[in-house]
Amino acid sequence: MTLRSISVGHVALDLMFQIDAFPDHPTKKHADAFFQGVGGMAANSAVALSRLGAKAAFYGPVGEDTATSTFLQHFRRLGVDTRHVTPLHGQTNSISAIVTDASGERMIYSHKGSALQQPGPFDPTCLEHQDVVLADPRCVIWAEQAMKLARQRGLPCLLDGEVSPAADLQRLVPLSQWVAFSDPGLQAFHPGPHADGLASALDSDPGVELAVVTLGGEGLLWQVRGQAAQRLAGFKVPHVVDTTGAGDTFHGALAFAWAQGQSPLGALRFASAAAALKCTRPHGILGAPHQDEVRSFLATQLV
């Protein structure tokens, strides 16, 4: 049966520029390539899930400007359900400028739209008939309501622990079942050693079962409630082209594998492989892999 997922949170208009190298001083810089796309953590995770074969939905606050039509066309083209998305009168959307160098590393400059700050009422029917829920912290009110409902209904719920105000993460982490932090996100939640931060997340509420922090090329550190923290090395790929969307691909793939019943280690390996493959492809989340590509890649790995 096809997995059904919903990603609740942020969508943004992405303006992506490719350059050879980042300058070391303020200057004008020629871009070798330009691409306009759609990003945002929840939006990207929905696309990643759709490409893996899930029946994916996105639900997040959007404004009334022209970017909304771009968002809806993007989701429609990539098979993501947006039936619950309604533009908010008088509000604006988020926009990001993403600059990627020849090594695949990137800088992101973002402006948060007013729709995230004044999202209107949350529609609880968006969680009906879902198998797994993802939430990001950009619209705290909606993330909180989505995760509370998921817990009440016994739905697996994954929080994207991206860097955010500490108060927001401290409000949301205890509502998650699994939480996947970026390194800066974990430091915002609990400054100090990674292992202490993961332990703090697990201690925040008995319902939190797994906490993980992704560390780029160094892999990740993860911990299941009642067990010691463990390291998982990152997968090596021949050439990194674009890391934009790799974290969101990881989150979508982690939710996909988890909801399908894989063990925590199996789900983390699947997600790590998906993120590694995404890094070999350009154009942000459009480079997220299909399920058969991830499984073929994993079959070539020794461990």
Predicted regions located by residue number:
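Glycine-rich phosphate/adenosyl-contacting loop at the front of the ribokinase-like
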Residues: 1-61, 66-70, 77, 240
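Glycine-rich phosphate-binding loop at the start of an alpha helix
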Residues: 39-44, 144, 261, 265, ...
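Ribokinase/PfkB-type carbohydrate-kinase core domain
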Residues: 1-11, 61, 72-87, 99-231, ...
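Conserved phosphate-binding/catalytic region of the ribokinase-like
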Residues: 1-6, 29-30, 194-303
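Short, basic and Ser/Thr-rich N-terminal targeting/leader segments
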Residues: 52, 91-94, 216
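Hydrophobic packing within well-folded, soluble alpha/beta domains
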Residues: 49, 58, 75, 97, ...
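Thr-Gly-centered strand-to-loop micro-motif
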Residues: 32, 39, 61, 135-137, ...
